Amino acid sequence: MSNVPVELKYSKEHEWLRKEADGTYTVGITEHAQELLGDMVFVDLPDVGATVAAGDDCAVAESVKAASDIYAPVSGEIVAVNDALSDSPELVNSEPYAGGWIFKIKASDESEIDSLLDATAYEALLEDE
């Protein structure tokens, strides 16, 4: 079973969301998602300042197996991207919940977070796959 930190929220598309002290949210893909994709070779990051709606594809993770869209779990403005992934996309594999984060977003409607899964619900989703 994949590592599913309890303090995070999850989308059904295997993104995770973590609230930061400054009120922004950090987004990445789950350990389960990176295991399915395999070794990352490139991450196409969103543009800082871009406005996205929940469910929009806003980044792409390319691995040796496939390219996979990364979706915004909430609506808002992209306020930062993980530039370290340009040189080290493998951080998504080795540190999916830390150094392998993809982007940070300032949520425009925090009520959307209520529709995301908690760790227990995400684990149940994984068991059903």
UniProtKB/Swiss-Prot annotation:
CDD domains given in the database record: GCS_H
Pfam families, per database record: GCV_H
InterPro entries named in the record: 2-oxoA_DH_lipoyl-BS (IPR003016), Biotin_lipoyl (IPR000089), GCV_H (IPR002930), GCV_H/Fam206 (IPR033753), GCV_H_sub (IPR017453), Single_hybrid_motif (IPR011053)
Gene Ontology biological process terms from the UniProt entry: glycine decarboxylation via glycine cleavage system
Cofactor note: Binds 1 lipoyl cofactor covalently.
Cofactor: (R)-lipoate
Domain of life: Bacteria
UniProtKB keywords: Lipoyl
SUPFAM superfamilies found in the cross-reference section: Single hybrid motif
CC per GO annotation: cytosol; glycine cleavage complex
Residues in Lipoyl-binding domain copies: 24-106
Residue numbers carrying N6-lipoyllysine: K65
Known partners and oligomeric status: The glycine cleavage system is composed of four proteins: P, T, L and H.
Functional description taken from the UniProt entry: The glycine cleavage system catalyzes the degradation of glycine. The H protein shuttles the methylamine group of glycine from the P protein to the T protein.
NCBIfam families reported for this sequence: gcvH, PRK01202.1
Protein family per UniProt: Belongs to the GcvH family.
Protein name (record): Glycine cleavage system H protein
Encoding gene per record: gcvH
